[in-house]
């Protein structure tokens, strides 16, 4: 499956000057919402990701996604795995489980994002799940920005990856674009202003 082509065909691989949810700047941005607005494409990607997970024999009770970016990917993946789908959301800047969602003690939870950069949002949501007695058994995403090592990839883990190294990380492909701290960004130095296309207000 050519994930990059799917993103390009959906006009979801954007070029410009972007501020990512991690706070870093990049010349490229993956707008997964443009890919996932087509239910057939969402199902195609989720089915491929679910196949990887099933082949690993990982046992999962629930998929949990951090809102807003991971919502559709999480639901589509849960459907493909035939398990429960829940999401965590920010309230006053802090991740919470709301809307009647509950976690049973020992419940095996797979965290899901559309894109994993450092994995910070997924791990914030994972801490909520763990605080309620859930067990984080893995992480999944449609695409990996190349900071964390996924299953079946030769990309190595970078120091700023926030995903635990003792659980599997599944993704369909690696997108290893250059990223810069704001003070080191060459586009900022040339006078360009970064725009924020994602879903976190920072």
Curated annotation (Swiss-Prot):
It is an enzyme of class 2 (transferase). The keyword Transferase applies. GO terms for molecular function: magnesium ion binding; orotate phosphoribosyltransferase activity. Orotate binds at residues 117, 145. 5-phospho-alpha-D-ribose 1-diphosphate binds at residues 113-121. Homodimer. This is Orotate phosphoribosyltransferase. It comes from Sulfurimonas denitrificans (strain ATCC 33889 / DSM 1251) (Thiomicrospira denitrificans (strain ATCC 33889 / DSM 1251)). The gene is pyrE.
């Amino acid at each position: 499956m050519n994930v990059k082509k799917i993103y390009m065909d959906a006009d979801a691989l954007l070029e410009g000057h972007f501020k990512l949810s991690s706070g870093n700047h990049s010349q490229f941005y993956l707008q997964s919402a443009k890919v996932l607005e087509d239910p057939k494409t969402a199902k195609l990607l989720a089915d491929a990701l679910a196949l990887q997970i099933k082949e690993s024999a990982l046992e999962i009770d629930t998929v949990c996604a951090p809102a807003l970016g991971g919502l559709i990917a999480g639901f589509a993946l849960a459907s493909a795995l035939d398990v429960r789908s829940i999401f965590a959301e920010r309230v006053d800047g802090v991740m919470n489980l709301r809307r009647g969602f509950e976690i049973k003690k020992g419940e095996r939870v797979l965290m899901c994002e559309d894109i994993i950069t450092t994995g910070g949002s997924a791990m914030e949501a994972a801490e909520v799940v763990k605080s309620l007695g859930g067990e984080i058994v893995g992480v999944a995403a449609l695409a990996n920005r190349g900071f964390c090592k996924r299953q079946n990839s030769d990309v190595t883990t970078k120091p700023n990856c926030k995903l635990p190294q003792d659980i599997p990380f599944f993704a369909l492909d690696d997108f290893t674009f250059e990223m810069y701290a704001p003070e080191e960004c060459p586009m900022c130095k040339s006078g360009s202003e970064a725009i924020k296309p994602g879903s976190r207000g920072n």
